[in-house]
Amino acid sequence: MRSTLACIAVFVGLCPSITSSQDANDRAHHIQNNVLGIDGHNDTVQRVVYENVDLGNRLSDGMIDIPRLHAGGVHVPFFALWVPTYYKGSEAVRRTLDLRDAMQRVLDKHPDQIELATSARDIERIVGQSKIAAVLTVEGGHQIANDLAVLRMYRRMGILSMTLTHFRSNDWADSSTGKPEHNGLTDFGKQVVHEMNSIGMIVDISHVSDKTFYDVLQVTSKPVIASHSSCRSMSDVPRNMTDDMLRALARNGGVVGVNFAASFLNQQDAEELKRKVSNENALEPNLAGTELDQFAAKEYFEDKGEFKVGHATVEDAAKCIDHIVKIAGIEHVGIGSDFDGITLVPHDLEDVSKIPNLTVALLNRGYSEDDIKKIMGENFLRVIREVVGN
């Protein structure tokens, strides 16, 4: 009898924490269902191209599909049209068009589930219809082939943002992970920024070198974003932002989307970024057309085979958000998962359906529902409205 009573006492003692945990989960799902959730960066279009997946179905692997976007409360994913930096000139443009076509096939196949958004008003209308509002971006300035006409063409195709560099420096801007060639932004690079401001295209400074970042802020007349970067104070990798950079971005009115790559969130995982960078930057295939695409496909599947869970956890992502809020302010942080572009993910944040786990972590840190709405989407929406327009 005494042992039975003792067990009952232990169970009763546990009940408040069990109930509290369930309450937090329920509240998190409620918030995610009612927030206008924006994820500032994913690489899911690669899966459409290389694996011919149907994003309308819940997939058995990968990190994003339409059902899991709804489950995670992410209604506005930024789909990156990313072309590896070993594609040069017209080949990079051709491949960008291939990716744009692949995304169009998704939109055409599921018009009742997903629609292209090209303005803030589009986003609000589409989400109001319980559909996914797809925002398209270009991830790498090499994809304009040093031609402002190509940049303008991308904008007319509904692309709202461009990352100025990727892993390598290009002809007009230095990358954070490439050999510095220009001491930041060249005169043509400054023209690119001016043109993006003029045509209503968001400047994305993820991937750029520190010097390029500060050069951009000297040139731009509009807020910029770091679509998928995190805190260098947590993981000392060049892709992350220093506290001074965070303050400067806040003064600009911009937003940093916290990257969920484990290597960006926990120093123990930092070697993974070095692996990815060294692998791509070492590649110089002397190929073109179909042969180059086949080479890229081989690299894609080899990289996908490296997928695993790292030392980082969802708590590290919350800690990074917390740090940015303290340094830059609540108005200047969002999420930029990099899902389907990362191979080392945090515990409890393995795909987009797990975003409510991050909401729970933020609630446990004392963030209000209004705070979380800003972090989960309103801050990015503000920049879209200010740069792209209604």
Residue spans of the language-model regions?
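Positively charged n-region of N-terminal signal peptides that target proteins for export
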Residues: M1-T4
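Bacterial N-terminal signal peptides
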Residues: A6-P16
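N-terminal hydrophobic targeting/anchoring segments and the immediately downstream early-domain regions
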Residues: I18-N183, R232, D236-N390
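Distinct, well-ordered alpha-helical segments
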Residues: E51, D147-L151, T212-K222
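Short, contiguous, pocket-lining structural segments
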Residues: E181-F188, D204-S209, M241
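Alpha-helix-loop-beta-strand connector modules within alpha/beta enzyme cores
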Residues: H182-S198, V216-A226, L358-A361
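Substrate-binding cleft of carbohydrate-active enzyme catalytic domains
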Residues: H194-I205, S209-D215, D243-R251
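His/Asp/Glu-rich metal/cofactor-coordinating catalytic motifs and the adjacent surface-exposed loops
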Residues: Q218-H228, R232-M234, R239-N240
